[in-house]
């Protein structure tokens, strides 16, 4: 039965939570990481709270997978984010990590070649889970957890638009957006899909540059 194909939401969430706990445990107990950097502020010692923070970031990023709704949208945004982290890792002298992020960026661009309209295949949650898990690890390795919301702002606003829509329908009994996630709202008001995608890319590039600069400046 195709309607029952794939994992349920709760099973997928359980996988993400398990990966988050494993990753948080590794960073805290194996790598000895117990603090995070805030832009223009000294290191913030959070101790064991780093583990739930890791889980929270991973779940938040995975929830942003709803951005995979238009041809070229998720691939373009993910490529921009990993390109920004290529620069961050390079200027932090983490050359191996920079090379890894560059390879991921290249892989996404290869995917994007076949995903631009009309898409021949799609990222879906299989790709989103791999990329968001990797992005969580990269954000902690570069100590940029608190600039990640800027670097990945298109992902953030996509998730928030769904949350706002659901809360508004439950509390107020009406919708804020014509359709959620936000990119479908723009389609509903008359924007062609290519315009939505390209404007998201432009916003993504701007946010990636700003986030990269803030991350690097905060280290000096």
PLM regions with names:
Residues 1, 31-43, 219-220:
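Membrane-interface helix termini and inter-helical loops of multi-pass transporters
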Residues 1-14:
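Membrane-interfacial loop-to-helix junctions in multi-pass inner-membrane proteins
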Residues 13, 17-29:
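Mid-bilayer segments of alpha-helical transmembrane spans in multi-pass integral membrane proteins
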Residues 27-29, 46-220:
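Alpha-helical transmembrane segments
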């Amino acid at each position: 039965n195709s309607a029952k194909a794939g994992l349920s939401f709760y099973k997928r969430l359980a996988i993400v939570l398990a990966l988050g706990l494993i990753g948080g445990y590794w960073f805290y107990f194996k790598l000895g990481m117990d603090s995070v950097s805030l832009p223009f502020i000294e290191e913030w010692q959070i101790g064991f709270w780093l583990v739930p923070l890791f889980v929270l970031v991973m779940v938040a990023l995975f929830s942003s997978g709803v951005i995979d709704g238009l041809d070229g949208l998720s691939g373009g945004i993910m490529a921009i984010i990993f390109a920004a982290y290529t620069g961050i890792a390079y200027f932090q002298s983490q050359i191996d990590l920079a090379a890894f992020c560059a390879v991921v960026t290249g892989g996404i661009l290869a995917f994007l070649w076949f995903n631009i309209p009309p898409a021949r295949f799609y990222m879906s949650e299989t790709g989103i889970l791999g990329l968001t898990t990797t992005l969580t690890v990269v954000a902690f390795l570069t100590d940029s957890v608190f600039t990640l919301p800027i670097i990945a702002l298109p992902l953030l606003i996509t998730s928030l638009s769904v949350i706002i829509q659901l809360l508004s329908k439950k509390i107020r009994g009406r919708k804020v957006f014509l359709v959620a996630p936000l990119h479908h709202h723009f389609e509903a008001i008359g924007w062609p899909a290519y315009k939505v995608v390209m404007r998201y890319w432009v916003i993504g590039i701007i946010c990636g540059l700003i986030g990269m600069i803030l991350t690097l400046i905060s280290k000096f």
